[in-house]
Amino acid sequence: MARKKKTRRVSDIMPARKVDKKVELPKGKQGKKLTRYELDAKAREDKKKKKRKGLASGSRHSATENNNNHQALAKKDPRLGSRKKVPLIVEFVNKPEKGMTIPPMKVEEKVAKLDPMLELEQLENNECLNQLLDALDAGKTLSAEDQQFVDDCLDRIAQLMDELGISEDDDPEEDLLRTFEKIDINQFR
C-alpha cells in the first residue's frame, strides 16, 4: 500500500490556527505600533501579492473587451489635445510664414591663396607630376586624365613664373663658355 502524506485540513471541528485567520490591519491608527503578529500577517499578504505576477488565466481574449468598454465609459476632456493637424511627413523644416520669404545666403567659395613662390615650389616638387613627365620623356603615352593633369600643372607653373618674373630661358652654351673664360680663378682661392 502506498504511503499517504498526512495533511491538516481546517474544518469546523478543529480550532483555526492564527496563521489561517485573516487579520484586519488597522489603517487609521498611526500612533499605535503594530504587534509582531500583525506585522507577520501584513508581510504574508504582501508576499502573496508579490508572488502573483502576470495576467489572470484566460484573460487574453477578455482583456480587449474590457479595454473597449473602459474607453467608451471614459469621458473625454475637451481641454486635452489640440485640434491643429500635425503633418506626418516633414517636408519643410524651416518653412517661412506665408508672405515672409527668407533670401537664400550666397556662399562664396573661399580658395586658400598660397604664396606664389610656395605654390610654384610645391608644383615643381610634385612627385606625381614628375613621374608623369618622366613617362612622357621616355615616349610613353598617357591617359586623357593624366595628360589633362600634366597640362594644367604646366600651365599653372608658367603662370606663376610670369607673376614672379622668373624666366625659363636657358643661357646659350656660348654665353656659358664666355663667362667661364672670363672668370678669374684667383678669386676663389
From Swiss-Prot:
Residue ranges, annotated region (Disordered): 1-81
Q: Which UniProt keywords apply?
A: GTPase activation, Ribosome biogenesis
For whether the record's keyword set contains NAD, the answer is no
Highest taxon, organism lineage: Bacteria
Q: Which InterPro entries match?
A: YihI
Disulphides: none
What is any one GO biological process for this UniProt entry? ribosome biogenesis
Pfam families, per database record: YihI (PF04220)
Please indicate if the UniProt record lists Iron as a keyword: no
Q: List, as start-end ranges, the regions of compositional bias called Basic and acidic residues.
A: 9-27, 35-46
Compositional bias, Polar residues, is annotated for: 60-71
Name the Gene Ontology molecular function terms of this record: GTPase activator activity
Q: What does this protein do?
A: A GTPase-activating protein (GAP) that modifies Der/EngA GTPase function. May play a role in ribosome biogenesis.
Q: Which family does it belong to?
A: Belongs to the YihI family.
Subunit arrangement? Interacts with Der.
Q: Specify the protein name.
A: Der GTPase-activating protein YihI
Organism, by scientific name, is: Pasteurella multocida (strain Pm70)
What's the source species' lineage?
Answer: Bacteria, Pseudomonadati, Pseudomonadota, Gammaproteobacteria, Pasteurellales
Name of the gene encoding the protein in the UniProt record: yihI
